[in-house]
Amino acid sequence: MKISNLIYIFLFSITTSYAQTIPDFTGETADNKNIKIPDDLKGKYSLLCFASSQKAQTELESWLDPVYQKFIAKTGLMDDMYDVNIYFIPVLTGTNLSFAVSIKNKFKENTQEDLLPHVLFCNENGKDILTNLKMQKSDIPYFLLLDKDAKIIYRTSGGYTEEKFDAIDDLIE
């Protein structure tokens, strides 16, 4: 009985992940390009990386090098075959919204140039996005892999592990 319950819970979590759509929102990349989610993501796989606090940002940074090497710099032997939208999304909520312009400008000054197109600042209140995506803990980063139709096919949270990264890699055709 316990095993069948575990199987049911596992299958339910997979289906909810696959069935979920990303809510509509707009943003601007750190290199000033306007992006409309999910419309501008269709046609390619997309990895969206959300962080809504300093602590979450620290864990998100553990993902930067592997994601950068595989999908942005494409340094591996077979990495050229990957054509994936990558967006690191600092989620601003509450009083941080009033500092959005200064946060964005400071970020641009301190970020290497080839990462600027991959940093997306939301135009909407980040709290709504977090709520819609059921991202309840502000102290951990969240990662969503979207298929070519911009549907969520995988989600994870927390610091980088090879298992999480391999799961993402395996889902990208």
Regions found by a protein language model. Give the residues of each.
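Sec-dependent N-terminal signal peptides
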Residues: 4-14
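N-terminal "domain-start" segment that seeds a small globular fold
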Residues: 17-38, 62
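Short active-site neighborhood of thiol/selenol oxidoreductases, capturing the structured segment around
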Residues: 40-64
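Solvent-exposed loop/turn segments at secondary-structure junctions
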Residues: 54-56, 92-96, 126-127, 152, ...
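Structural microenvironment flanking redox-active thiols in thiol-disulfide oxidoreductases
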Residues: 56-112
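Thioredoxin-like thiol-disulfide oxidoreductase module
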Residues: 98-139
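Thiol-/selenol-based redox modules, centered on thioredoxin-like
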Residues: 138-173
